[in-house]
Amino acid sequence: FIEIKNEFHKRMGYITYDMDGKKTCLDLWVECLNNIEPINQYPEYTDLLSRLELNQNGQFLLLRYGQYSDIYNGEIDNSGEELWSIYDGFYRECRSIVIDIVNDKIVLCPFAKFFNINELEETSLENIQSRIGNAKTVEFSNKLDGSMQSATWYNGQIIMAGSQSINPNTSWRLQDGYKMIYQLPGYERMLREYPNITFIFEYISLKDTHVVKYTKEQEGLYLIGMRSNLTGEEYSYESILKFAKLYNIPTTEIFNKTLDDVMTELDDKSSDEA
């Protein structure tokens, strides 16, 4: 991002953060650079953006990898494995990451892209078992069945994002997430006291049902992750549970189980078991 921004400023002699319809300032920078004679001097920038979905709201830009069906011309059966290895795994980090385009800072840094067992070679059951055998710590957590939302305290205010939206005025899920944040005082206090951390939540709502069936009483924002905006370090589930208890907010569960236990129990789960 900074490279493209600096190149635009060098070639054009100014910088602008304006949008044009759905085109973000980043789209326009690359478009403008490629219109300089001789045209299309920056194919690598065009290629980089071709696999991204961008969403801008003022000075904030959300970057997310595109849907497989878009990237691979409708071939949704393609696993997309190539996507996650090119550009040194750049797209793995583009999972609704949000940057301040004016000050060149990471604002929200959610989980990097992760995969199901046997979805890729790196997550084959054999490789996972090998990594567990060499790991210092292994944690098993309940995977809630909602939508990811992330939040942080930035420049004196709460900033939230969903999977594809940074503007609550255009996303009812995100708008609902903000309401949930302000319903419990612990959320805002936690965000204020740890401004350089992205807090990652599972948004559970009866209006946003998936496979698992939840009750009205189970609606809310469940703390499922924390990540440093400065280093990218992810916090352990043990730390997450401590934060949730300290600030009295809902969270996930961790279990004292083996991988074999988990794999066996998966076959016995029904759609109303969270």
Q: Where are the predicted features?
A:
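Core nucleotide-handling region used for phosphoryl-transfer chemistry
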Residues: 1-274
